[in-house]
Each structure stands twice: as C-alpha cells, then as structure tokens.
Amino acid sequence: MTRQRVPALVIAFDTTAQAIAAETLFTAQGLPGRMIPIPSQISAGCGLAWKAAPEQRQALLSALDAAGAAYAVCQTVLLLR
C-alpha cells in the first residue's frame, strides 16, 4: 500500500521558545494541530513546526497575531498522511 501525500499547513519557528509559546497558545485556545519536526521542504531555525489542516490557517495566524507571537514561515506543503 502506498502512503498518500496530503496538504498540511505548517507554521515554523526560529526558536524553540517561539514554538513552545505557540503550542501553549494554540492548546489554551483549543485550536487544532500538533507540533512536528520541521519538514524538509521548509528551512527555518529551530527544527519545530505546528501542523494543522490548511483550512485552519486564518484561525492559527489570527491567534499568533493577537498574542504578538512570532513565527518564521507559514505555508501549505504535501506531507505523508
């Protein structure tokens, strides 16, 4: 059986502190997703990224902006399911 690649929203961070702050924020607000190792398609500093469904982009970025939280890159990439 071949594993399928599906679109995923990935928010990458420059520092581990930024990643942990975002994870804490998203969890506290009940926003979907999880922390993953940064995919090879993205180049950013700390090696951690938040993965969620692409349709969650606006909610996640709005939460980061409202909290004044920093992130390096936000893009949709194809990841193995």
What does each of the following model-derived ranges do?
Residues Q4, A28, A69-A70:
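A generic structural signal for short, non-catalytic loop/turn and secondary-structure boundary residues
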Residues P54-R81:
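C-terminal structural segments of small proteins and small subunits
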